Amino acid sequence: MKKILEVKNIEKYYGNKSNLTKAIDNINFDVNKGEFVGIMGASGSGKTTLLNCISTIDRVTAGHIIINGEDITKLKGNNLNKFRREELGFIFQDFNLLDTLTAYENIALALTIQKVKANEIDKRVNEIAGKLGIKEILKKYPYQVSGGQKQRIASARAIITNPK
């Protein structure tokens, strides 16, 4: 099996020298292509911090995170931004949909930023919306749809760019 994620000896500290808090302590694991992984633990155990580090929202204090052979802990600036755009898809717990955009516009946003042609955006949004059963709500705003529909909009937005 091909490793798509390697987490090696990662640690994450918050604060300064006089008041350090260790959020993650020497975590190691691998994920192979096709595997599904659940992260479980008590409140405050570092689950969100771990996922924020893997998703490049936060940086590790020590250790390495390797995604598809690339050590993301070494990426910075434009290289990190490019990696996020092309390799990752994010689904946030609270959806992070933009209230001033319709469901269609929220889903299409990443493609618009990547300067994909309008007809290709329309094709891809409608295709994913059809697969997720949300075609009928594409013209609605986030405040007009249910929590489950918001989750599907967020899921569509995460996969619209075909992240690896």
Where are these regions (language model features)?
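ABC family nucleotide-binding domain
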Residues: 2-5, 10-164
